[in-house]
């Protein structure tokens, strides 16, 4: 397992900052030599992407260098929602390099996003990031990425995450510090229990012993059985995610009253995202907070959700990454809405990126890396159920095994 390395030592002969600037040092060199910059990336993660140069797509030039390679996430259990089941999730891992420093990102694409490895690699192949010779032009770079073609939010998020990781390394700081967030304020993360048979549900609950809140997938005829099965095994607080599975508002309200008696603390996306009036009625009468997920994809959706939901679930793969997620968080708080920072099934790369925002969120659902069996990274940790940020630059990522190859 490898760790980030920092360069804290300066030679006695190193010129002063003013002398450096006077000698025409670039801003990047100035930042690097004044000790704000981490050394050039992760040795272990570098080996993880070593095969990219030969096998992957690549755009290069004097500016940013983008590399990407397909990956498939293997789920520990079949993942069943209200309307679908799957055992794998398609993914694309990317790297973004500048002057020997590398940032990492990923695009995780569950079916409902409408993206695929083919669409993501096609999108990434169209990007000309070599035109940018200064990674600190983050707004310009990400506006360009978003403008290339519509949709492709997960693919765009992969570039956004890698750029944030890169810039954080150039600054020598994790993003939660750059944003001024207190790592002590991170919430507990929920652990997801997908729809399954009572026997498998009990097994999943047993695996989730370290977690202080469980997220239960509902939206089928077995909803009450799911909750009763879980309650027979644990008394920890629950939240439920219906994934648009309830269509009758009165039935939904009756169910929420019953769920409150069972120790549920909030309800996520109980009705279809198109049922706006019904959802607003349900929120008005609900004894529990309601959270919009599928209804809230990007920044313009936050204002639309006000009055329809009590809060929103922000996911990097929906909103094109950390930049817009931070904007959504800020806007939601200004509207007095609650915020959950969520995820898809993802590696520790995207989870660590999302975790940088968690200190300002009421809830976290950052277990996507815990639901897969082939996570190539190590990043944010969960300690006694609590999201625990790492004081490492960028998003705080390292490779689990320096010999690991794609």
Model-identified regions with their sequence ranges:
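Basic/polar N-terminal segments that are highly enriched at the extreme N-terminus
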Residues: 1-14, 43-62, 406
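N-terminal secretory signal peptides and thylakoid transit peptides that target proteins
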Residues: 9-38
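C-terminal segment of N-terminal export signals and the immediately downstream linker at the start
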Residues: 20-24, 45-80, 87, 97
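Flexible C-terminal active-site loop/helix
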Residues: 32, 36-37, 41, 60-75, ...
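Metal- or metallocofactor-binding catalytic centers and their adjacent structured scaffolds
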Residues: 60-68, 84, 96-97, 102-170
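Conserved, mostly hydrophobic/aromatic
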Residues: 94, 100, 159, 172, ...
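Shared catalytic-loop signature of beta/alpha-barrel
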Residues: 147, 274-281, 285-289, 296-394
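Metal-dependent enolase-superfamily TIM-barrel catalytic cores that perform enediolate-based chemistry
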Residues: 175-286
